[in-house]
Regions:
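Residue-level marker for the onset of beta-strands and adjacent loop->beta junctions
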Residues: 112-114, 201, 309-311, 382, ...
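Surface-exposed coil/turn segments at beta-strand junctions on protein surfaces, enriched
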Residues: 74, 109, 120, 151, ...
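Outer-envelope beta-barrel architecture signal
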Residues: 123-125, 168, 212, 229-233, ...
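Catalytic-domain carbohydrate-binding cleft regions of carbohydrate-active enzymes
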Residues: 300-304, 322, 329-562, 567, ...
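Bacterial N-terminal signal peptides
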Residues: 2-16
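Structural preference for beta-rich elements and adjacent junctions enriched in aromatics
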Residues: 22-421, 427-429, 440, 804
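Exposed, low-structure sequence patches enriched in small/polar residues
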Residues: 379, 465-810
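Surface-exposed extracellular loop regions of Gram-negative outer-membrane beta-barrel proteins
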Residues: 274-324, 413-469, 539-546, 635-639, ...
Length: 810
């Protein structure tokens, strides 16, 4: 049949509403009236079946701490995933009940009943979920994109800690219609859940008059687990009711402990788990036609269509080690980065990784600081990755050849990470990175880190690293980094203190370190009061933080800090998913005269520019943010701030040159027109007015619109429009208003810059499962000579692309 035959067959089966190539069965209910069309069908019949079998099933009540579940084994279940839970095979499943709320009120019985059936077969683990609801009209359910419903829909989340190590767990999340969300829970990471990895599994859900029901089937070959004849897995099930923000779990949770996974239940005595030797082959075919503006002639022209072939491969070396490889990868379906305001930024901006190959196994590379930043591999020709866990040691290695276009040649990148378990929840790790460009330059970093959990409540993070950067036959530049932080987990009194020291010579070219040559000390204390169950104010409280930055030599010489910030914040959350916070801070900056070397006033006799130090003392700022998580058909977030801020002379190394009053605001609004159609509107604006005379130094305005229509779980169309207008003026002396010159070989003024860009993107996508896709997309880059001069826009570049890939699991 061939590659395209398989692709078309899969598309036909999915559109017909039956099991496709991957065996997925979806409810045949799509479009604007999805929820309404399935009301009244399912939950009543499911509850009748439950009543008749309750005496036969083994029930494990989480509220009674019945958290150890012996293997609920069934060899050959005949279960068709349709969200009904009416097959007799479910009678053999263990039943998880007795959910308790952990947010906003901890320890009380859940407001709505949840019952989860668990089955383990020779090929998969299955979950049958009955989420009862006394207000079925209040159930939030949309045909959202994968991983995209966490802030809009009700959901049930299953955590599987397959190594039972309390450090990492698979996350499988479903909304009432069976739409999938998946990722990896990483204890101690900044985001807690990494939603980027996608796994192959099946799900189906239905809404009825008493709530909703969902069936899930997770193949064992989609999981990594120990190579052991008998093993235990950590198990947790959570449920969120979106209309009120109530969250409950099967195994009771408390915020008084540092580790969430350590509070999970357990699937005990799992035997005969044989995933088989996993082999995924994922060929990719792309075609594109690109256009651009010729810088010499000013004419716009398009090139002839071109095509390309790439290949992705995943091979299960063992049940716990995986090899991933890619050749000529294509990331054309990846959404472009949202525009960021850059008119007064001192440091490089961080952009999250979005490319599929680099997302798998990224949890192993999580560290207190980003010594591994895979976006530093800009355009790989090919790459390979090994990741997994052997005993109590997690390992990961990425090797890549980057097509950088640099004059020093294409760099070869190697990233190695090893992390070992210590005790119940602690870890120690090592990282090594090497970026070598054809023998012309090199950068190497060696580091170690530890996360130590003390008395179940306190977490100590420590990290030390050294770097070597240079070229052959030249002196190597050495650098060091050290940090330590201590935090206290609590639902009421929270504490955190940290220390970080980075030498000026530290370079991590495969990582992302925002500042070097500094020493930072900061501390934070906060207290939270919580209302009774059902109270109007669910939680509220203040927090106080203090930060100080020193030039590294000045810190060790006992001198005053270069920058300080004292901040007092107040936050509150109200019934119905409404919240906000208010922050008042006071900043000070002290820069020695030597940092202003090379800056002069533009006068007949150029004189050195040395602003008065007191200009940058006691600058204040006031920030306000509020949000409504989901209110009927909308979700909204608002923010505003008014502050005094330095104007930084970027050519002078980021030194403050003037003071401005900064006015900023942003709004993000998501509208749920139907269960299939959503629209997002965002607007960000920042204006800096010179404090001396109120004249404008800079302004930036970025409106963004996105619309998405989900025809089915697999088929969607998306459109994005974003306009970015940013202007920056020249640096002026804060007293006289004289222009400031930057002089090295010659003297030049920073007379400002401006950009007014418009970006349009359109994408039609068909993605029945991760790796099997058809994308047809178009993008256009335009600009205009004046702000919002939409009648004067000219096209700078455009591109039309088609991508097709199929994931063969052998």
């Amino acid at each position: 049949m061939g590659f395209y035959g398989f692709l078309l067959l899969g598309a036909g089966l999915q559109v017909a509403g039956v099991s496709g190539v991957h065996g997925e069965a979806y409810p045949d209910t799509t479009g604007a009236d999805t929820v309404a069309s399935i009301q009244g069908e399912v939950v009543a019949s499911a509850s009748r079946v439950t009543a008749s079998r309750a005496a036969e099933a083994s029930v494990y009540d989480g509220s009674l701490r019945e958290l150890v579940v012996p293997q609920p084994r069934l060899e050959e279940p005949s279960i068709r995933l349709d969200g009904r839970l009416d097959e007799e095979a479910w009678e053999a499943g263990a039943v998880l009940s007795g959910f308790t709320q952990y947010d906003p009120t901890e320890g009380i019985a859940a407001t709505q009943e949840t019952r989860v059936r668990v089955l383990v077969t020779s090929e998969a683990i299955l979950f049958g979920i009955q989420a009862f609801d006394g207000d079925p009209d209040g159930v939030r359910a949309t045909l959202a994109q994968r991983d995209g419903f966490g802030r809009s829909d009700d959901y049930v989340r299953v955590l599987l800690d397959t190594f039972n190590d309390n450090r990492r767990a698979y996350v499988f999340q479903v909304n009432p219609l069976g739409v999938q969300g998946d990722g990896v829970w990483v204890e101690g990471s900044r985001r807690e859940i990494d939603w980027n990895p996608d796994f192959l599994w099946e799900s189906a859900g239905r809404v009825g008059p008493r709530g909703y029901s969902v069936e899930m089937k997770i193949p064992l070959n989609s999981l990594r687990f120990p190579d052991a004849p008998v093993q235990d897995w950590g198990l947790q099930v959570m449920r969120r009711i979106q209309r009120n923000g109530f969250e409950a779990s099967w195994a009771p949770l408390t915020g008084e402990r540092a580790s969430t996974l350590a509070q999970s239940g357990r699937l005990q005595g799992l035997e005969g788990l044989e995933p088989g030797r996993l082999l995924d082959v994922n060929p990719v075919v792309t075609a594109r036609r690109q256009g651009g503006l010729d810088s010499e002639t000013g004419r716009f022209s398009r090139s002839s269509p071109t095509g390309d072939v790439g290949m992705n491969l995943t091979y299960g070396l063992t049940s716990n080690l995986t090899l991933d490889a890619t050749y000529n990868p294509d990331f054309s379906q990846v959404e472009a980065d949202a525009g960021q305001i850059t008119v007064n930024e001192r440091f490089a901006l961080y952009f999250p990784e979005k490319r599929p190959f680099f997302l798998e196994g990224t949890d192993i590379f999580s560290m207190p600081r980003n010594l591994v930043y895979t976006r530093s591999i800009a355009n790989p020709v090919g790459a390979a990755k090994v990741s997994g866990k052997v005993g109590g040691v997690s390992v990961a290695h990425i090797g890549a050849l980057d097509r950088s276009g640099s004059a020093t040649g294409d760099p070869v990148v190697n990233l190695l990470r090893v992390k070992g378990d210590v005790g119940g929840s602690s870890t120690v790790g090592m990282v090594y990175t090497d970026r070598t460009a054809s023998g012309e330059s090199f950068n190497r970093v060696l580091g170690s880190d530890a996360r130590i959990v003390l008395a179940r409540r306190y977490t100590l993070d420590v990290m030390a690293a050294a770097s070597a950067d240079g070229r052959p036959e030249e002196d190597t530049r050495w650098g060091s980094l050290f940090l330590a932080s201590l935090s206290r987990a609590s639902r009421s009194l929270s504490l955190r203190a940290s220390f970080e020291d980075v030498s000026r010579g530290f370079r991590a070219r495969s990582g992302f370190i925002r500042r070097v040559g500094t020493t930072q000390v900061d501390g934070r204390v906060g207290y939270t009061w919580r209302g009774e169950a059902g109270a109007l104010v669910e939680r509220w409280g203040p927090s106080l933080s203090l930060e100080g930055y020193w030039e590294r030599p000045a810190f060790w010489d006992g001198k005053a800090p270069r920058e300080t910030e004292l901040s007092l914040s107040f936050s509150a959350s109200f019934r119905g998913n409404v919240g906000g916070y208010l922050s008042l801070s006071r900043d000070s900056y002290t820069f020695p005269a030597a940092d202003y070397e090379g800056l002069f006033l533009d006068s007949p006799e150029p004189t050195p520019f040395r602003p008065q130090a007191q200009l940058f003392q006691g600058l204040w700022s006031l920030r306000l943010r509020s949000w409504i998580s989901r209110w009927e058909g909308a979700r909204i977030s608002l923010g505003a701030s008014l502050s005094e801020t330095p104007i930084f002379h970027r050519a002078g190394g980021g030194v403050p040159a003037d003071v401005a009053e900064r006015l900023s605001g942003d709004v993000d609004l998501t509208l749920y027109f139907t269960s299939s159609f959503t629209g997002e509107m965002g607007l960000r604006h920042v204006t800096l007015l010179r404090k001396r005379d109120g004249s404008r130094y800079s302004s930036a305005t970025i409106p963004r619109l996105e619309a998405r229509y989900q025809f089915s779980r697999a088929l969607f169309v998306r459109g994005i429009g974003e306009y970015s207008s940013q202007r920056r003026g020249g640096i002026l002396d804060p007293v006289s208003g004289t222009p400031v010159l930057s002089c090295d070989e010659d003297c030049r003024s920073s007379d400002g810059s401006s950009s007014h860009d418009l970006r349009l993107e359109g994408l039609v996508g068909y993605e029945p499962s991760p790796g099997t896709v058809v994308y047809l997309g178009y993008s256009r880059q335009m600009d205009s000579p004046t702000a919002f001069g939409l009648g004067e826009v000219r096209t700078r570049a455009d591109g039309l692309f088609l991508k097709m890939s199929y994931r063969f699991r052998l």
